[in-house]
Amino acid sequence: MITIKKGLDLPIAGTPSQVINDGKSITKVALLGEEYVGMRPTMHARVGDEVKKGQVLFADKKNPGVVFTSPASGKVIEVNRGAKRVLQSVVIEVAGNEQITFNSYEANQLVSLDRETVKTQLVESGAWTALRTRPFSKVPAVDSETQAIFVTAMDTNPLAAEPELIINEQSDAFVAGLDLLSTLTNGKVYVCKKGTSLPRSAQSNVEEHVFDGPHPAGLAGTHMHYLYPVNAQNVAWSINYQDVIAFGKLFLTGEIYSERVVSLAGPVVNNPRLVRTQIGASLEELTDSELMPGEVRVISGSVLTGTEATGPHAFLGRYHQQVSVLREGRDKELFGWAMPGKNKFSVTRSFLGHLFKGQLFNMTTTTNGSDRSMVPIGNYERVMPLDMEPTLLLRDLCAGDIDSAQALGALELDEEDVALCTFVCPGKYEYGQLLRECLDTIEKEG
């Protein structure tokens, strides 16, 4: 067991009940183009086209062979683009059950499949896009290889679902997915989990590792740091547990499995719980009649790293397993910094709230102050469990010192790995955005 001591479990109200419920019927789904780092689309569908589930909607010019397929059958009703014609989303009005089918196999046949057979079916079905590389967090090239694949079978994000509940419901598909991943690498498949029992693969290169501690103990970046540190030469892949289930379902049934169990939670959700929906589901429909009155912000993903679900982005992200909802923090409090703060949370124990152990807080979107200079008071070290110098690294990101940031370990990180640093930063810096700019520059300049 690897025990993480540094970190932070955010004490936010609205924890979901760990029981899976059926979500609302969804009439619109979408693929969000901006989720895929560095992707430049070649469109294969246009507004008005009827598409089947599994049909190619667009491909990546910069990553030949990688295609992105429809999560449902229906009609393309929107292709939304932003500044410089960046693809924001392709929206489909769900209708019918037509789908493209693929080869199916018995569970005992999967381990005998060769790598090219597995890879070809994953690529053609669009399931390949569930994998992400580290460094850079991109969809791996079709002809690339890795010595390590990390399965994130735990989730320490605030308000997250308990993975073992979902995995044990689909145990056969999960094991099948692990067997398939074992064929994609000559190295190891690391299944990172809490201390609970999960279905196991019998393959010799599939290993289980137990992590314990506060967030970010459940992040792929943390697991890689301790088990297989990445750099420009050592590239690892990661995948979440629900996509492992989807891999298994694809090969066992020959059909694309687009179902997703997500936590619908937060301080302004009437009944926080786990709901069964699908990848790309409209969050306007999913949250209809579920929220308390007032101005709220719906977030696809964690409150720490998710994206605001509004306009062309109002859909469940490809890599997201939760929908979080916060109240918009528009109200200003006179001399709020001088008040006792019984109902306020502070990492530095600036308010009385820290005296009440176990108290959950109705957090909002307010930043509690305006932008200011970066002040190193030890906050970053409290929440960063990785063996690196967070204050120096974050300072270099702010200054745009790419060489120094790379030397301090920037290639190991993704936006989610510095999310807690953003949360505890008294200067209100968005370190995830600064890190992404740094990684883009490193990749561009080689």
Swiss-Prot record:
Enzyme nomenclature, EC number: 7.2.1.1
One Gene Ontology MF term: oxidoreductase activity, acting on NAD(P)H, quinone or similar compound as acceptor
Superkingdom: Bacteria
First-level EC class: translocase
Keywords from the UniProt entry: Ion transport, NAD, Sodium, Sodium transport, Translocase, Transport, Ubiquinone
Chemical reaction(s) catalysed: a ubiquinone + n Na(+)(in) + NADH + H(+) = a ubiquinol + n Na(+)(out) + NAD(+)
Pfam families reported in the protein's UniProt record: NQRA_2nd (PF24836), NQRA_N (PF05896), NQRA_SLBB (PF11973)
GO biological process: sodium ion transport
Function: NQR complex catalyzes the reduction of ubiquinone-1 to ubiquinol by two successive reactions, coupled with the transport of Na(+) ions from the cytoplasm to the periplasm. NqrA to NqrE are probably involved in the second step, the conversion of ubisemiquinone to ubiquinol.
Oligomeric and partner information: Composed of six subunits; NqrA, NqrB, NqrC, NqrD, NqrE and NqrF.
HAMAP family: NqrA
Family to which this protein belongs: Belongs to the NqrA family.
Protein known as: Na(+)-translocating NADH-quinone reductase subunit A
